[in-house]
Amino acid sequence: MTHQTHAYHMVNPSPWPLTGALSALLMTSGLIMWFHFNSMYLLMLGLTTNTLTMYQWWRDIVRESTFQGHHTPIVQKGLRYGMILFIVSEVFFFAGFFWAFYHSSLAPTPELGGCWPPTGITPLNPMEVPLLNTSVLLASGVSITWAHHSLMEGNRKHMLQALFITISLGVYFTLLQASEYYETPFTISDGIYGSTFFMATGFHGLHVIIGSTFLIVCFMRQLKFHFTSNHHFGFEAAAWYWHFVDVVWLFLYVSIYWWGS
């Protein structure tokens, strides 16, 4: 590394890909054990090792970028392409749920009563909690943009304030969604309506939790002065992800809550 004559990052040997693969094996095996034998020990072990692997792997990346200076502009460009491709893959992931929803709702079968929502299903009112959730996420999109602009201008205080507001709105959204799930008059086992509703909104909720975790890490890193106005890809990636989650919710709201009701 001392005689390096290029701007690329030659990664040092790391144990985390191996521990990540083993934890994934434990998690999938644990799911089978849970489904068939009602035992969660293997699943919990898999989740714990997976969480530890993610923490330690990302900790190493922070060290390489912030303290060792390995993330040159050309390396950051590669990371940006990687994040863009990851978000594109997530778009197709959600496209599958929307496809299932529209396939079922545009031509309801006789078993559903020939109508949508299916006979016997009482849909949620889109003008109540779902509309509040929409406004909460749209507001969080504004505050994350404020945080980004503050960081670009070197205004640390405003960046931290805006990031804190975004995290608070993300947590509030999750609590609202949990309370809505608690009150729904249908379940995931209520035919195609229940399964598409809970799969689509449930995975979106999971993405909000993941995005909130990313932003909390960014908040803690900013408290330690890790970001500068021209070196902050970790925050940029989290902001892109948050905007993606925001846009997916708009499609969910219009499709499943408003049109689908």
From Swiss-Prot:
Organism listed in the record: Halichoerus grypus (Gray seal)
Transmembrane segments: 16-34, 41-66, 73-105, 129-152, 156-183, 191-223, 233-256
Topological category with respect to the lipid bilayer: Multi-pass membrane protein
Any Gene Ontology CC annotation: respiratory chain complex IV
UniProt entry tagged with the keyword Manganese: no
Subunit details: Component of the cytochrome c oxidase (complex IV, CIV), a multisubunit enzyme composed of 14 subunits. The complex is composed of a catalytic core of 3 subunits MT-CO1, MT-CO2 and MT-CO3, encoded in the mitochondrial DNA, and 11 supernumerary subunits COX4I, COX5A, COX5B, COX6A, COX6B, COX6C, COX7A, COX7B, COX7C, COX8 and NDUFA4, which are encoded in the nuclear genome.
EC number of the protein: 7.1.1.9
CDD domains named in the record: Cyt_c_Oxidase_III
UniProt cross-references to InterPro entries, sorted A to Z: Cyt_c/ubiquinol_Oxase_su3 (IPR024791), Cyt_c_oxase_su3_dom (IPR033945), Cyt_c_oxidase-like_su3 (IPR000298), Cyt_c_oxidase_su3-like_sf (IPR035973), Cyt_c_oxidase_su3_a-hlx (IPR013833)
Gene Ontology molecular function: cytochrome-c oxidase activity
Keyword line: Membrane, Mitochondrion, Mitochondrion inner membrane, Translocase, Transmembrane, Transmembrane helix
Catalytic activity: 4 Fe(II)-[cytochrome c] + O2 + 8 H(+)(in) = 4 Fe(III)-[cytochrome c] + 2 H2O + 4 H(+)(out)
Role this protein plays: Component of the cytochrome c oxidase, the last enzyme in the mitochondrial electron transport chain which drives oxidative phosphorylation. The respiratory chain contains 3 multisubunit complexes succinate dehydrogenase (complex II, CII), ubiquinol-cytochrome c oxidoreductase (cytochrome b-c1 complex, complex III, CIII) and cytochrome c oxidase (complex IV, CIV), that cooperate to transfer electrons derived from NADH and succinate to molecular oxygen, creating an electrochemical gradient over the inner membrane that drives transmembrane transport and the ATP synthase.
Name assigned to this protein: Cytochrome c oxidase subunit 3
Mitochondrial intermembrane side: 35-40, 106-128, 184-190, 257-261
Record family assignment: Belongs to the cytochrome c oxidase subunit 3 family.
Subcellular location: Mitochondrion inner membrane
Top-rank lineage group of the source organism: Eukaryota
Record topology, Mitochondrial matrix segments: 1-15, 67-72, 153-155, 224-232
EC class: translocase
